[in-house]
Amino acid sequence: MNYDVIIIGGGHAGVEASLASARMGNKTLLISMLAENVGATSCNPAIGGLAKGHLVREIDALGGEMALITDEAGIQFRILNQTKGPAVRGSRAQIDMDRYRVIARNKILNTPNLELVQEMAESLIIEDGEVKGVKTNLLNEYSAKRVIVTSGTFLRGVIHVGEIKQIGGRYGEQSSDALSASLKSCGLEMGRLKTGTCARVDASTIDFSVMEEQGGDELPNPFSFRTNREEFRKTKKQIPCYITYTNQNTHDIIESNFYRAPMFTGQIEGRGPRYCPSIEDKINRFRDKERHHLFIEPQTLENTECYINGMSTSLPPDVQQLMINSVKGMENAKIVRYGYAIEYDFVDPRELKHTLETKKIKGLYLAGQINGTTGYEEAAAQGLMAGINASLSLQGKEPFILRRDEAYIGVLIDDLVTKGTKEPYRMFTSRAEYRLLLREESADTRLSHYGHTFGLIDDENYERVKAKEAQIQEGARILRETIFTPNKEFIAFLNSIGEEGVRDTISAEQIVARKSFDVSKMLKLIPEFEMYESYILDEILVEGKYARYVQKQSEEIQKMKKYLKVEIPQNFAFRSISGLSKEIVEKLESFNPPTLQAASQISGITPAAIEILHIYIKIDIKNRNK
């Protein structure tokens, strides 16, 4: 049984990797332990969020499926951080978890060149440092030129619920111990991480009337640029989430049972996600907090079960029931599924190239939680990139590597492969130095030309993106070139829309840059913009408001590209540089990087440190040439 590409694991990374591979013309096999769980959302019933929404839109722009599935399975859509700048706003959707999985599986089953088989991959076939295929638990051998491992939390997975430990990669499913051993035998450095999930509660036993209702946006925006926006808004049915809070009684119940918490007893060894702590960890670390938010999220459109966001736990079942019942609105709530923690093996992502191919084994790619990340979106992004790069390598083409100034996906992969991680890695807008250039709404105009080149975005959708980009550029040009003089009529106009007058000649771009200027005012200033759709107007306004900042950031990028090529002189005296911390100096001395590019890839070396180093290198060269 011969294939071009084999993907091991049918989670979010596996779905994107297998679809990309098959659509790029490769005979592809997806191996999954349970065929019905392909595309399953193991934890929260939501896609997107701050920075994660950026990833979903970038996946979409490159031709991935996550956004399209979310638009179809979504039951509530919101833009987070709406009052903040456009660079840090994030789209988030509640999804029908059952529907999401069905849609994902159907896409897999109906894609040409792609086969799905329910088996457990147990070992990799390696010959002379190159992957040749996969052996399964049913003693089948599948040959392939490229293999992508997207194993999620299944590598030597151990589930913890109070004092109880059991082997499993997800509750009710087996772990993959043999595959973990096979990866280790390849010489890959591996570690141990932990994640967790909360209890699911019978929705009919919750009193929503005493909770705060949290609805979706009145005019919901789809995730995918390929989804018809107007039709989506007309037909999309949304249901609310609810907010309640823990209280002192909740905290007392949890604290009095710390001695039974696996994360405190030493039962759990793996490090958990810093930014998604368990409720027992929150109570322990933030003892001054009188309460913590809990978001009650429906898992399906029918709302039969609710996910208690903010209450991830591995406490024993009896304690989970007590703490749930201590919360307002859940006094009579009944748990359907208990929360648990799970420990699993991961591969140090510094073992990877930027293509996500391993450095030690040719043709072997890794994507998702196996690389130390947490989150559906981070996994899907890696899966897509691995699928694309595996395909390009088979075609003898150049690898596809996104830069940090091109995409959040570029930031994600660069962080992983250059810095590694000791805890589950989550994407944040703060990780992106060039976030003004990487807004959610610009993902399609930034990246869809790549997706089109790879054959993952069709001509019709690509032409639509080009038309959008042309309209935005034309609007931005009009703002730049429309000049107003400070005469009485113009000042009176500004005053009439609640704006202060001007003393000097001014461009429309300068006027819309004012904080108080919105789309309605821009339409009065430039009436010809009435021909544009609302989402185009939003982008034109953003272009106008941030033009000078974007220009400055673009100049910084060009400057950085130029001096990253600069060589660091041999035996350079790093300790003579003022402005560098002791930690940075020690790392530079330890690694002794040959260029600024190499120095920038050392964990903990900041862009500011690179700039300082560049200045001192120029001084050193100048002194040597005297």
Curated annotation (Swiss-Prot):
Stored Pfam families: GIDA (PF01134), GIDA_C_1st (PF21680), SAM_GIDA_C (PF13932)
tRNA processing as UniProt keyword: yes
Cellular localisation: Cytoplasm
Matching SUPFAM superfamilies: FAD/NAD(P)-binding domain
Keywords for this protein: Cytoplasm, FAD, Flavoprotein, NAD, tRNA processing
Cellular component aspect of the GO annotation: cytosol
Residue sites binding FAD per the record: 9-14
Residues the record lists as binding NAD(+): 272-286
Family, per entry: Belongs to the MnmG family.
Protein name per its UniProtKB record: tRNA uridine 5-carboxymethylaminomethyl modification enzyme MnmG
Source taxonomy: Bacteria, Pseudomonadati, Campylobacterota, Epsilonproteobacteria, Campylobacterales
